[in-house]
A protein has these predicted regions:
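Domain-scale signature associated with acetyltransferase and cell-envelope carbohydrate enzymes
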Residues: 2-156, 180-181, 199, 215, ...
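Short, flexible, glycine-rich and Lys/Arg-enriched loop motifs at helix boundaries
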Residues: 83-88, 161-168
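Beta-rich strand-turn-strand
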Residues: 136-140, 188-201, 207-211
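Conserved catalytic-core motifs of eukaryotic protein kinase domains, centered on the activation segment
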Residues: 159, 166-167, 195, 229-231
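Flexible glycine-rich beta->alpha loop in the catalytic core of nucleotide-sugar glycosyltransferases
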Residues: 160-161, 207-208, 214
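Glycine-rich NAD(P)-binding loop of Rossmann-like domains
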Residues: 168-179
Length: 235
């Protein structure tokens, strides 16, 4: 409880819960200490509330002018898929980029977030990315709220390289990606530049998303195709 500027706690209840938690997960002490210094270093803390809670070894790297905006809390790490993934999550922000965490967002172990120079990435409240996934934002990527993004998924808004054609034209290097609210993306998917995925859509495992997906649709395959409409899913 926050009372008159002082932090007050029901001590017997607090001690009992803390002892039980530490017995079940002794690594928690290390993670709490590490999270404290991570928040302190990036100046994203208040006295009694961590904005970032991270497993030991998870990293946040910011270039000059990069801004990490956290409305509520960003979780880095945790246990997913039976604790089979042990690599650490990372956030790397190049100069003048913005990563806006619009609520509570969870990035699982092995998840890598990269925002290129001047890029803007936003992720909505109650969205999680499970494990070993990559989000590379060179320009603009928006992920809505209540989304579930499974392991080994890649989301890109860039081709990385120019492709020149015989008629003296070339590919458009970057295009924004828009993922709506309450979208479920299965494991091993790739979402390419310029794609919009509508609200409540479901993307099946191993799908290459290279074109728009309407709301409330089930899309699968490579090449991707919509196989069901008016679908709903629950977490």
């Amino acid at each position: 409880m926050w009372n008159g500027g002082w932090l007050s706690v029901d001590k017997p209840m607090f001690n009992t819960k803390m002892v039980r938690t530490l017995r079940m997960n002794p690594k928690l002490i290390l993670n709490v200490i590490y999270s404290f210094f991570l928040n302190l270093f990036h100046s994203i803390r208040s006295f009694y509330r961590f904005r970032v809670f991270a497993d030991f070894g998870s990293t946040i790297t910011r270039g000059s002018g990069a801004r990490l905006i956290i409305d509520r809390r960003l979780y880095l790490g945790g246990k997913y898929i039976g604790d089979m993934v042990h690599s650490k999550s990372s956030v790397r922000m190049y100069r003048d980029s913005v990563f806006h965490v619009m609520g509570r967002v969870k990035l699982g172990p092995g998840v890598g977030i990269v925002t290129g120079p001047g890029a803007m990435l936003s992720i909505g409240d109650n969205t999680y990315i499970t494990a070993s996934s990559v989000v590379y934002c060179a320009n603009r990527i928006t992920i809505g709220r209540d989304c579930a993004i499974a392991w080994n998924t890649t989301i890109l808004d860039t081709d990385f390289h120019h492709i020149h054609y015989p008629d003296d034209t070339e590919n458009e290097l970057v295009k924004p990606v828009q993922i709506g609210d309450h979208v479920w993306i299965g494991c091993n998917c790739t979402v390419l530049k310029g794609v919009t995925i509508g609200d409540n859509a479901v993307i099946g495992a191993n799908t290459l998303v290279n074109k728009n997906v309407p709301p409330n649709c089930l899309a699968v395959g490579n090449p991707m195709r919509v196989i069901r409409e008016d679908v709903e899913w629950k977490a």
